[in-house]
């Protein structure tokens, strides 16, 4: 099946950050086979031609760190620091989850993400009360591209920890698929919730199965103080001593890093998922993304969960990310629009090991989203496309979402998820949780 999308303004995110006016994209099954400008007069025979009527077409956004199973917990822990937020709000409520609640919560997060332009994401879920196979089936049904990882903790007894490791290893062996629509990573929660033995076992699983690692690290000053007091090392050095960086690793946050740590992370191919809104809301601080990029670290933008954000709008994250860097460095050139877009598309895809997506180029997967600026005053005059995408647009502006060549959202309607049912069930299940 070959489909041509014509009469579009195409934000390619290729090496030149080329924007093609009056362009077209040809998709064969799940791949892009041509991207060009001008009237469509290709040598390719196509089955369908779709007039985009001047819409902006850009790569699907890539969310490098989130927790969709927590989507029912939106708004339950506002105005709290990380540790009390986790200990008095999040973990007690997650302990009440059932497989049905977890699926309903996941569906809500998936629906929000895909309708706001996210096509790929990396996720960590707490396995308590969760049917992991049902979660993976739900993500698959959404049509999204994802790395969904089972989180490990050292809560309970040593026997509980051993069982958690065994279950996580089985999960990795079952779901790791580097080039598929769904894959996974090894995901110890953090150095303050995992024992040294558990972190070492996670490193072993990652090496033996050739997977990536995903962990919260260097998120707060308190974490750094506590880990240094307990182990005599800061979190980066401690994680490295446990062997976690033997495989490509994504650290969520990296708010509290010094120059030596940034150089070390770059040398060991440790990538950072940058969560600006969540870090601000939890009072964790502001990550120095400018310094990370200058050190050579791969960085991708992320939302974290709705419980700490409180939405999954990657356009908002792009805008906040670039404004924060300009503000803390008192440098208006810090994190320009092209870089911000890269950190939410091609660069983010590289961070989570999904190089097959993130830009609109021949050979890449057909993952793209559209915005119709014609009826949106906040996107006018419409000729400054890149600026508007970062500084003016929002997830509410999305018209269409194509993932792997399939129309997942079309004219604002999600084709893979039942929006009315999901919203109804989310409210019903939320009322059953006891604070």
Swiss-Prot record:
User: Matching Gene3D superfamilies, A to Z?
Assistant: Metal-dependent hydrolases, Urease, subunit C, domain 1
GO molecular function: any one?
Answer: metal ion binding
Q: Where does Zn(2+) bind?
A: 65, 67, 216, 304
Q: How is the cofactor bound?
A: Binds 1 zinc ion per subunit.
Identify the cofactor(s): Zn(2+)
Write out the transmembrane intervals. none
State its Enzyme Commission number(s).
3.5.4.28, 3.5.4.31
- The residues the record assigns to binding substrate are 94, 150, 189, 219, 304
Catalysis performed (reactions): S-adenosyl-L-homocysteine + H2O + H(+) = S-inosyl-L-homocysteine + NH4(+); S-methyl-5'-thioadenosine + H2O + H(+) = S-methyl-5'-thioinosine + NH4(+)
> Is Metal-binding one of the keywords UniProt gives this record?
yes
Query: Would I find Zinc among this entry's keywords?
Result: yes
Database matches in Pfam families = Amidohydro_1 (PF01979)
Keywords (A to Z) from UniProt: Hydrolase, Metal-binding, Zinc
EC supergroup of this enzyme: hydrolase
Q: What does this protein do?
A: Catalyzes the deamination of 5-methylthioadenosine and S-adenosyl-L-homocysteine into 5-methylthioinosine and S-inosyl-L-homocysteine, respectively. Is also able to deaminate adenosine.
Q: Which family does it belong to?
A: Belongs to the metallo-dependent hydrolases superfamily. MTA/SAH deaminase family.
Question: What's this protein's name?
Answer: 5-methylthioadenosine/S-adenosylhomocysteine deaminase
Q: Which organism is it from?
A: Bacillus thuringiensis (strain Al Hakam)
């Amino acid at each position: 099946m070959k489909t041509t999308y014509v009469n579009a303004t195409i934000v390619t995110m290729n090496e030149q950050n080329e924007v093609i006016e009056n362009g077209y994209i040809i998709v064969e099954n799940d791949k892009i086979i041509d991207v060009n400008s001008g009237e469509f007069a290709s040598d390719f025979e196509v089955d369908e031609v779709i007039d985009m009527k001047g819409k902006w077409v850009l790569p699907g956004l890539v969310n490098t760190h989130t927790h969709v199973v927590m989507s029912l917990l939106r708004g339950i822990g506002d105005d709290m620091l990380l540790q009390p937020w986790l200990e008095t709000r999040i973990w007690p409520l997650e302990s009440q989850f059932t497989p049905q609640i977890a699926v309903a919560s996941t569906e809500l997060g998936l629906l929000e993400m895909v309708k706001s332009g996210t096509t790929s994401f990396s996720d960590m879920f707490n396995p308590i009360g969760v049917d992991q196979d049902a979660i993976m089936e739900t993500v698959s049904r959404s049509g999204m591209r994802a790395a969904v990882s089972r989180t490990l903790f050292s809560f309970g007894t040593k026997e509980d920890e051993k069982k958690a490791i065994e279950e996580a290893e089985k999960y990795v062996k079952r779901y790791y698929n580097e080039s598929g629509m769904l894959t996974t990573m090894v995901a110890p929660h953090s150095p303050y919730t995992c024992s040294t033995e558990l972190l070492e076992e996670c490193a072993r699983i990652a090496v033996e199965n050739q997977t990536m690692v995903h962990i919260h690290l260097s998120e707060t000053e308190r974490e750094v103080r506590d880990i240094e007091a307990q182990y005599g090392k800061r979190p980066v050095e401690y994680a490295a001593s446990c062997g976690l960086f033997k495989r490509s690793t994504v650290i969520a946050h990296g708010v509290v890093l010094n120059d030596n740590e940034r150089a070390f992370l770059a040398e060991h191919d440790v990538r950072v998922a940058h969560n600006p809104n969540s870090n601000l809301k939890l009072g964790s601080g502001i990550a120095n993304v400018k310094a990370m990029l200058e050190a050579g670290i791969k960085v991708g933008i992320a939302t974290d969960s709705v419980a700490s954000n409180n939405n999954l709008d990657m356009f908002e994250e792009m805008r906040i990310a670039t404004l924060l860097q300009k503000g803390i460095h008192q440098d208006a050139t810090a994190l320009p629009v092209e870089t911000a877009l890269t950190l939410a598309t091609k660069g983010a895809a590289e961070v989570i090991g999904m190089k097959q997506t993130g830009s609109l180029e021949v050979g890449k997967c057909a993952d793209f989203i559209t915005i119709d600026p014609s009826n949106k005053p906040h996107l006018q005059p419409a000729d400054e496309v890149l600026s508007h995408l970062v500084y003016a647009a929002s997830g509410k502006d999305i018209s269409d979402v194509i993932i792997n060549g399939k129309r997942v959202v079309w004219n604002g309607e999600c084709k893979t998820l039942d929006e009315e049912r999901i919203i109804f069930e989310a409210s019903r299940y939320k009322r059953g949780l006891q604070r």
